[in-house]
Amino acid sequence: MKPRKIILMGLRRSGKSSIQKVVFYKMPPNETLFLESTSKLTQDHISSFIDFSVWDFPGQVDVFDAAFDFESIFTQVGALIFVIDAQDDYLDALARLHVTVARVVTINPNICIEVFIHKVDGLSDEFKIDTQRDIQQRTQDELADIGLENVPISFHLTSIFDHSIFEAFSRVIQKLIPQLPTLENLLNIFCSNSLVEKAYLFDVLSKIYVATDSSPVDVQSYEICSDFIDVILDIGSIYGRSSQLKPGHSPEILDETSSVIRLSNDLVLFLREMNQYLALICIVRADNFEKSGLIEYNVQCLQTAIQSIFSPRT
């Protein structure tokens, strides 16, 4: 699969660099307070199960300036993520967003435009909803005035201090995976035949879920599965083989890694590696997990199918 280009944009201090460091470099959120504001265009290649080229544009830089080759930059972009600080006056940010969207869609009409309404951790639930509604309505009205009412834009409430940023990035990444419908169908079949309540395919580096079955995503189940990955990687770093992790490169799950945790609510978490970067995490009722042999057989079938999907065609 060829690398996907993702562009992060937004005004200064909107939180773009913090998002990138937390999601792809496992930086603790509290440490992002000491990050300096981005002063120049940075490009990071994130090497994992799915390769990404993430471009972080400084907030003070005008990408439409003659110094930038605007067309060549945006022609091959899979997704544009525009970050808005929800705790600040966002009218200037919206003005920049509207201009950016109007220019970008003329160059790349298939680009995925995602708006992260960021830093919502300090806001009440009611204020979050009101802020999202206001930003969404202003954007739709402004674009409609210039004849772009049909441009699809997705809005996400995000914070680096909880799992919402990973959930939002998961939604973005899934739009860039052409095999997503096939993966979802495989997971649906697996869950049905294995009596599994919920199944996720996680990218280990970023804790982004590449795909899940068609049942509704419950925030609590996603959070506990995401935390499960941290536990496995932490234990692996202590008792597994020693390796120095390069920035932007995924920690590898050891071959044939599997783990089971029984929860107090009569549920079982089951993890199984699909390859060195991708892990399957399932939520199973304890009674159904007694048929672990059946589940293991179906996992092997699923693993074979996934590997065949992404294997190079000759």
From Swiss-Prot:
Keyword presence, Membrane: yes
GO biological process terms held by the UniProt record: cellular response to starvation; negative regulation of autophagy; negative regulation of cell cycle switching, mitotic to meiotic cell cycle; positive regulation of TORC1 signaling
CDD domains given in the database record: RagC_like
Membrane topology qualifier: Peripheral membrane protein
Record's catalysed reaction(s): GTP + H2O = GDP + phosphate + H(+)
Pfam family, one: Gtr1_RagA
Protein's UniProt keywords contain Chloroplast: no
Enzyme class: hydrolase
EC number: 3.6.5.-
Family: Belongs to the GTR/RAG GTP-binding protein family.
The protein's role, per its UniProt record: GTPase involved in activation of the TORC1 signaling pathway, which promotes growth and represses autophagy in nutrient-rich conditions. Also required for TORC1 inactivation during nitrogen starvation.
Designated name of the protein: GTP-binding protein gtr2
Classification lineage: Eukaryota, Fungi, Dikarya, Ascomycota, Taphrinomycotina
